[in-house]
Structures are given as structure tokens and as C-alpha cells.
């Protein structure tokens, strides 16, 4: 795996964990070079404990949390694009002129193309069209990725950004509704608050269908690193977070498998693999 290169394109610090953290850690441990692009510093995120950050310092704190997670998972380099967190859909943060969703798509595309051509990844990971749960920034990075990948491969596009590079494969990490339901059931069995899961019906309607998952990975060997990465993001995953309600042994069982849908090239048939790099000439 020493010559393999994997690039994650995401919106916020902590996007690198839930659907893919164990996979990133496992590939990194076996020699794959893993890099991450984060378009914002999560300025509009929560602050679980006021002792950890203020609204004014949150971006700086979350950058350090991201770097902690990167060290934990084996990510060799993180690029922050510096756009502002757009916040949840319908909030005032959406209107900020510096918000990522208000950025110039052509500018973002060019910046991503430059990174792709420099790093020359064999696999790119990014959000599916709904962005997991409809976050505007998640949807934006999905759209910008699908624009940047063919642009990076086009030798006529912006020669000043480096030599053209055709990315062999793009995947969407998928957080299955079934995984969240399992977590809910285990929390209910312990008499814990499960109100967080009330919006699952919306995920069922807009989320990624199970029959279009192409790679299933058992991350039992690196699920501890994944859970440790959650703890790096202390401002987002405080004691009240649903990801800290179950004992670690149970959470390790719930999150043991990670799922990926192949976006580029579109697979001709449904097929379940175990390796994102399968059959890619390296």
C-alpha cells in the first residue's frame, strides 16, 4: 500500500470520523498516504463546554482539534481552505458573505484542482448528494468535488495548476440508517435519551440506499482510533453527545463497519468489495 494515495474532501473538522475514520486509520497504518481538505474551520459549530472555546475562538480551537484527529488517524496533511462555516440550513450563518456556500464555485474548483494535481490521489472520498443530513456545506463540497475531478483530468483546464491527473475512483462514505437505529436501540435499552434520532425518517427519505453500497469494510482493528478521534473534537462531542452515551465496547461494536458507495466511475453493476483501491493500477 506504500504507493497508494487517498484524499478526503470535506467541509468541517470532525467530518473525517463517523463514516470513514477507521478506514483512513487502517490505510494509513499500512502505508497509504492520506491527506484531507477541510473547507471551513467549523466556526458555526456547537461549544459543548464554555471552558473549551468562545464563539470568537472556536475556529482556532477546532483547527487544533482537527490536527489532533489527523494525528490519531494517521492523516499526513490537512489543508484548510479558510471559508467560513455556513451553519445549518435556514440559519443566519447562511447569509454571511464569507460562508462557504456563498463562495465562488469557480474559485473553489480551481483550488481543489490544484490540490488534486499536486497530490495525485488514486481515491477521493467526499459526501454524497444529500451531505449525510442536509448540511449546506456538505452538499457544497459534494458538488465542488464532482466539478473538480473532471477538471483536474482535463489537460486544457488551467495548466498553471499543474499537470492533469485523472482520479481513478471517487467514493461516498455512507452512514447507514441501520447503524443509527442500532445505536438508538442500545441507548433505549439503557433508558437513555434518544430524542436525537427523531429525524431519522428524513434520512430514510433522502439518504443513500443500502442497495447502492459497493464497499463494506470491517474496521475492527482501528475502531479504537476512530473513537479516539471523536474525543479530539471535544467542543463538538461533549458528555451529552450521543456518541458518548454508550460504553466504549458497545460503541466499538456499533461502528465496526464502514460503508462506501462508488461515485466515479459509476459502477456497471452492484458489487460489494472490501478494498477502495481494488484493481486500480498503482
Describe each PLM feature range.
Residues 1-7, 93-94, 98, 102-282:
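Metal-dependent de-N-acetylase/amidase catalytic core
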